[in-house]
Design a protein with these regions (language model features):
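Predominantly extracellular beta-rich ligand-binding scaffolds that present long acidic/polar faces
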Residues: 31, 36-48, 56-228
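Right-handed parallel beta-helix
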Residues: 1-51, 63
């Protein structure tokens, strides 16, 4: 399903074993450009796509950002050939801030080259403000070398911003709001990349383990952490 310049409201639906063979777009759903995608009480299972195993969201330059709200849904065993095992979202030089919202969702067993569950990527200096609240992440795997089954990392998120000509990160372009997300393993990482070095989550993050998950680089800070 491709949503472009229109609105799609998906409720109480199952998306099973869909595949997108294009170079972009999610295995089940692709929201493109000035559009609205609202997903509630849906299940995305064993879908496969190039960017976003289940859902891919692509902003386009000089247009309003897509409006995305995903709630109370399950993403299980989806595979992305590239970024975002379950969901991939990217912004461009849009005329407004891209602010997708994902709440009360479960991500389990998804696989992508960058971000086993989610990849959020700002391809321009335009600010991106994703919100993630009350989500569960378990056994989502990131494998940059998709042809090598021995190289897997448990990485839930991959968030990266635009870099300059010298491959240095520009000022913060991805500003996530993360609260009360539950990680089954402490190694369910937030990041696999340090393109935005100064990201401050300033959120309540709960880990179902005895130690904080690792960080590969950058100067991330967390507040109000709880381990159970």
């Amino acid at each position: 399903m491709r949503v472009s310049g229109s609105n799609a409201f998906l409720k109480n639906s199952l998306f099973l074993k869909n595949r997108c063979g294009a170079s972009y777009g999610g295995g089940a759903v692709c929201a493109y450009g000035d559009s609205e995608l609202r997903v509630e009480n849906c299940s995305f299972v064993e879908n496969e796509g190039a960017a976003g195993g289940a859902i891919g969201v692509n902003a386009t330059a000089k247009n309003p950002s897509p409006r995305v709200y995903i709630a109370n849904s399950t993403f299980a065993n989806n595979i992305a050939d590239d970024r975002g095992g379950a969901i991939y979202m990217q912004t461009a030089t849009t005329v407004d801030v891209f602010s997708p919202v994902i709440v009360n969702c479960t991500f389990v067993g998804n696989l992508g080259s960058n971000g086993g569950a989610l990849c959020v990527w700002s391809r321009s200096a335009t600010t991106m403000k994703p919100t993630f609240v009350n989500n569960l992440f378990a056994e989502n795997y990131s494998n940059t070398w998709m042809d090598d089954e021995s190289r897997f990392d448990i990485v839930a998120f991959y968030m990266a911003g635009q870099v300059d000509a010298n491959n240095q990160p520009l000022p913060q372009t991805v500003l996530p709001v993360c609260k009360n997300n539950l990680y089954v393993a402490a190694s369910d990482g937030f990041f696999a990349d340090g393109s935005n070095k100064a990201v401050n989550f300033d959120s309540d993050v709960i880990f179902a383990a005895t130690e904080q998950n690792p960080w590969d680089g950058g100067d991330v800070s967390y507040n109000h952490q709880t381990s159970v």
